[in-house]
Each structure stands twice: as C-alpha cells, then as structure tokens.
Amino acid sequence: MSKIFVNPSAIRAGLADLEMAEETIDLINRTIEDNQAHLQGVPIEVEALPEDMKKLQISDHQQGQPSGGATGQDGSEEEDFYMTESENPYIPFQSYLDAVGIQLVRKMKTGEGFLKIWSQAAEEIVSYVAINFPLPADKESAEKSTQTVGEPLKSNSASNTPNKRSKPSTSTDLKAQEASGPHGIDWAASNDEDDASVEAEIAHQIAESFSKKYKFPSRSSGIFLWNFEQLKMNLDDIVGGAKEIPGVIRMAKEGNKLPLRCILGGVALTHSKRFQVLVNSEKLGRIMQEDLNKYLAN
C-alpha cells in the first residue's frame, strides 16, 4: 500500500494563503460598509432639485396655465429615506461573498492552484463592487452632493392677468424656464394633446423593456444600472410621468420608438429618492438631451 507524503511547508503556505484571502474579504466588507454609511445614517431630505420635471416643461401654453405636474407630491417627498432590508445592497453582497468562498474551497479540493483560483475570484469581486457600489469622491463632496439646492421656481403671475398681457409674457417665461432647467438641456420638442392610443403605445414600449437595465452616471466616476421594476410604481403612473417629458407624446402618436432610458431617468429622478442619491444630475441631463435629440431626429 502506497503512502502519500504531504510537505508541511506546503500546508503552511496554503493556510497562509487562506488567511490572506479572509483578510482581503474582511477588508472589502469594511470598505463597502464605510462607503454605504451615508445610506444607513440620518435620512436625506431633498428639498428642491434643479432636475425636477416641473422645470423641464416647454412654455407652449397660450393662456399661461401652469402644468399639472406641479401639484401634489409633497406628501411623498416628505417621506424619510430609510433603506429596507430588501433594498440594502450590502445583504446580497454578503451572500455573494459567501458563495465565492464556497466556490474557492471546492476548487481547492480539486487540486487547482490557489493563486489562479483567487485571481479569478478577485476579478469577479472587483467587477461586482464596481457595478453595485460606486465609490464617492470624498466625504465632503458626498455630503454636499446629497443636499442639492435648486433655484426656486418663479410664480407665473401671467395666469391671473388679462389676455392682452399674456402675449408679451411668453418670451420671459421661456427664458425663465430655460434658466431653471438642468445643465446642458434645451428642450426643443413640445408635447401635443394625447389620447388613449398614445398612452397605450407608451405603456406597450415600456412594458416590453420593463426589466431591462440601463446605464446611468453615478455621483462617482462610475456607473450604475437601473430599470423600471426598481421604481416600484404602477405602469399607469410611469406612463403619466413619461408624458411630462417633452416630445414623448409626439413620438408615441407617430408610432416611433421612444427614448426609454430618457423616460426612465426622468421618472426616477422625480419619484425615486434612492435614484436621486446615486445619480449624477449634470451628466444625466446631458444624456437625456442626447437621447431626445437622437430619437426626435429619426
């Protein structure tokens, strides 16, 4: 009967590698926990956003009437931002690390080299963290960026004036709305009156891509993925928010393909506080404008 001799130095080296792997995973956990501290602490109150959809309207009113989107979301805006257990990204990441550890042990039992196994696992962990946990630039920029301050909307006094004064005020209204919109956005398309067929077309295109994830710029230099399911809204409410984006009704009435990423970004920016915390508003404004220009040109 043959005997298999194991070199004690090889066992010590393997144990040292395992300890190094455990320390690396613990370091990643602590880093992510520190970076997510601003999501677990005091709730963030967003008083006013320059990207609010009320400011993206086009002054195409003949009677200077304010848009209907300017009413009634104070109750939902005042809700405190607390992450539930299902929304906490740290919990699925912990499960992911546990699964990676199990895979490491199984591969090592088959006789594969630890360095090769760990290099592959490290690449997977780094890619997972880069996608799901974009790092903030620093604490100061994070604190300043989470509290966005927008210019207050000027009240439209022309709605209470006679019709004779409504025509001269249209040019000033256009300038005020252009100044209050997001950086780099110049809305050139207006929404026409819609009907049931338009709503059906918008709902159909959104439903087809309801679970598709789109890339959005984060407050750090990275990106994050978002889809319509994460809005946790009814399809009718999403369609209502999409109709407030200039040009969407016109494209739907003509049967053209809709800029779904632009629609998702606009609706999420208004209704999702978590999206507001993660997204880079300036870059999002440029992306939404580029998508609108691209789809309107077709």
From Swiss-Prot:
One of its GO terms (molecular function) is RNA-directed RNA polymerase activity. The modification Phosphoserine is found at residues 211, 272. A motif (Nuclear localization signal) lies at residues 212-215. InterPro entries: PP_M1-like, PP_M1_C, RABV_P-like_C. Signal peptide: none annotated. Keywords: Chaperone, Host cytoplasm, Host nucleus, Host-virus interaction, Inhibition of host innate immune response by virus, Inhibition of host interferon signaling pathway by virus, Inhibition of host STAT1 by virus, Inhibition of host STAT2 by virus, Interferon antiviral system evasion, Phosphoprotein, Viral immunoevasion, Viral RNA replication, Virion. GO terms for biological process: symbiont-mediated suppression of host innate immune response; symbiont-mediated suppression of host JAK-STAT cascade via inhibition of STAT1 activity; symbiont-mediated suppression of host JAK-STAT cascade via inhibition of STAT2 activity; symbiont-mediated suppression of host type I interferon-mediated signaling pathway; viral transcription. Phosphorylated by host PKC and by an unknown kinase. Coiled coil: none annotated. A motif (Nuclear export signal) lies at residues 49-58. One of its GO terms (cellular component) is virion component. It holds the Pfam family PP_M1. Residues 57-79, 141-190 are annotated as: Disordered. Residues 144-174 have a biased composition (Polar residues). The keyword Chaperone applies. Homotrimer when phosphorylated. This trimer is stabilized by binding to the L protein. Binds soluble protein N, and ribonucleocapsid. Interacts with host STAT1, STAT2 and PML. Belongs to the lyssavirus protein P family. Non catalytic polymerase cofactor and regulatory protein that plays a role in viral transcription and replication. Stabilizes the RNA polymerase L to the N-RNA template and binds the soluble protein N, preventing it from encapsidating non-genomic RNA. Also inhibits host IFN-alpha and IFN-beta signaling by binding and retaining phosphorylated STAT1 in the cytoplasm or by inhibiting the DNA binding of STAT1 in the nucleus. This is Phosphoprotein.
